[in-house]
């Protein structure tokens, strides 16, 4: 299962096409729209969210609520397009008096993209590199999420830090499975702890008062996974590498850890590795801890997969940093776009989708099949074999 997506931030729409989707998968339009709404939520979002009310339109690959084995096309309309029809026209001549973007923002793709593509207008770069494009990615991920849910896998996320405000958890790589959707989604910053939520909101307010932006970290958790997804034989097989690539593909992500992550460099081996035990009640091998975050040797262990992701502050500042005007080559203030103060809660929702795609691919590779019935049968057989190995 893979997807491609197209569209500009202020174009008419964003489009995603998901290929290699097995037939017989039930897809919920309302669930995709719910994920799109979660992406738009979160304390610290900017004015664009008051304009857009994202909903998905599916134009191929689904009939009567089930996939039919052909590519699924999903579209999300940009309501703000009506304010940009002249400046973002697909055809015709450039309008007279068009204001070009010539003061690239530090920390954004503006300057390097303009140099790479030989353009004197950073608008061509920022329209595509804008995080607005993640609406299409979240819509596409709805297919992967439905696929995983049908196989008993759940993917969720929560924010554990914004600026200096941190949700201090006890044994997070085990206890994270106890957080409910209600705990997470009722928080304005998608943090399952009320005290930490208040502290995070205060950090966002501090950045807003200073006309600045602020970043943070979040965790993505996947439960219900079978052991053995991914591989150890080649570099491309390793699920750790695939997940890292997928998470780093999201705008503004600067760090990814699995389980204890960088903390392992400070610990002894006996403090890091998870002892293996036999669970005779469930007929399976398991571990007494989950410091590895559900991944060993590039494969899933069957324990919750836990990734922690760091997001940098958004580079569009209301108190701009210095830059160089590409026309005059003189010092100038960087350009200002309508932007968020903090988008960490929204980025976590995008990351859920990217993790879902990687895991969906891993299931398809391991259990094959052109339809859900075959995939489920193969998965059932694999689970039965695993039980016999632990008896």
Model-predicted regions and their roles:
Residues 1-391:
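Generic N-terminal targeting/processing segments that precede catalytic cores or assembly contacts
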């Amino acid at each position: 299962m893979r997807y491609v997506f197209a569209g500009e931030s202020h174009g008419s729409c964003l489009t995603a096409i998901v290929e290699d989707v097995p037939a017989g998968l039930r897809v919920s339009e309302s669930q995709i729209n719910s994920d799109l709404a979660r992406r738009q939520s979160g304390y610290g979002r900017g004015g664009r969210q008051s304009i857009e009310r994202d909903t998905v339109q599916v134009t191929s690959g689904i009939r009567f609520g089930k996939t039919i084995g052909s590519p699924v096309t999903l579209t999300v309309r940009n309501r703000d397009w009506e304010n940009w029809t002249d400046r973002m026209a697909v055809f015709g001549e450039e309008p007279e008096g068009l204001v070009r973007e010539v003061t690239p923002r530090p920390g954004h793709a503006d300057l390097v993209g303009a140099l790479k593509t030989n353009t004197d207008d950073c608008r061509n770069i920022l329209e595509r590199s804008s995080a607005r494009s993640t609406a299409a990615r979240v819509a596409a991920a709805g297919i992967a999420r439905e696929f995983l849910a049908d196989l008993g896998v759940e993917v969720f996320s929560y924010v554990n830090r914004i600026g200096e405000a941190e949700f201090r958890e006890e044994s997070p790589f085990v206890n994270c499975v106890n957080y409910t959707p209600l705990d997470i989604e009722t928080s304005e910053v998608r943090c399952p702890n009320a005290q930490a939520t208040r502290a995070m909101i205060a950090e966002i307010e501090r950045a807003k008062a200073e006309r600045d932006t602020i970043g943070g970290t979040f965790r993505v958790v996947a439960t219900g996974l079978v052991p053995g997804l991914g591989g150890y034989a080649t570099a491309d097989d390793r699920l750790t590498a695939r997940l890292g690539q997928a998470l780093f593909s999201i705008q503004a992500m600067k760090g990814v850890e699995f389980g204890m992550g960088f903390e392992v460099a400070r610990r002894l081996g006996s403090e890091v590795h998870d002892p293996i035990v036999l669970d005779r009640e469930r007929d399976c091998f398991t571990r007494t801890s989950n410091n590895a975050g559900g991944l060993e040797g590039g494969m899933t262990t069957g324990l919750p997969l836990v990734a922690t992701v760091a997001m940098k502050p958004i580079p569009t500042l209301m108190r701009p940093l210095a830059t160089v005007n590409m026309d005059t080559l003189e010092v100038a203030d960087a350009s200002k776009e309508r932007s968020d103060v903090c988008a960490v809660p929204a980025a976590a929702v995008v990351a859920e989708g990217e993790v879902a795609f990687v895991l969906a691919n891993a299931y398809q590779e391991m259990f094959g099949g052109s339809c859900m019935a075959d995939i489920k049968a193969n998965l059932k057989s694999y689970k039965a074999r695993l039980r016999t190995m632990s008896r």
